[in-house]
């Protein structure tokens, strides 16, 4: 749904603002139901934040399959895999969907985070114990049929991310100064 707003600044100029909602109200309700249920069932108040993040990390990658069709054809409409809805409701995701889903959980858990991106990829940046860490569920989710949780990209420093040098995690450090 698109909402158009026009504001008259003077007799000569008008500025038009278009706001595109990423989710319908029904989708937001469904996402919140899943997030609230997972937090209620798997997270306790006395858990350290890192443990909470690991539980959510594993939940998402255990319940999501990487959407190869969307990766190969950006116009594929089979799943909404580039959104948290695709990840949490449909069970299919691409990097944007994984990052959005994780950000929603982190926000609900009051853990400071950003999504960090470049032309090719998007992942999460998480503030924990006074430092910033990278968190990439897309690259931690094994594409094979084997259900093995990886944590190569679980709360790693920028230095470690640069050591991995996979070519997809380059970012502008003048924009993401926290990293």
What residue ranges belong to the model's regions?
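Secondary-structure boundary elements
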Residues: 24-87
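Leloir-type glycosyltransferase catalytic cores
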Residues: 155-179
């Amino acid at each position: 749904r698109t909402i158009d707003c026009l504001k008259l600044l003077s007799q000569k100029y008008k500025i038009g603002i278009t706001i595109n909602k990423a989710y319908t109200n029904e989708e937001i309700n469904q996402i919140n139901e899943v997030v609230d249920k997972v937090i209620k069932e798997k997270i306790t108040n006395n858990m350290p934040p890192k443990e909470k993040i690991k539980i959510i990390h594993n939940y998402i990658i255990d319940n999501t399959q990487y959407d190869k069709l969307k990766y190969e054809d950006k116009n594929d409409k089979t799943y909404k895999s580039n959104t948290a809805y695709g990840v949490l409701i449909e069970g299919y995701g691409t990097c944007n969907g994984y990052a959005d889903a994780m950000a929603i959980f982190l926000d609900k858990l009051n853990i400071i985070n950003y999504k960090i991106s470049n032309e090719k990829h998007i992942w999460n940046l998480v503030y924990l114990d006074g430092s910033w860490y990278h968190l990439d569920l897309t690259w931690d989710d094994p594409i094979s049929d084997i259900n093995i949780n990886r944590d190569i990209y679980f709360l790693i420093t920028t230095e470690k991310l640069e050591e991995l040098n996979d070519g997809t995690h380059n970012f502008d450090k003048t924009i993401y100064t926290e990293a």
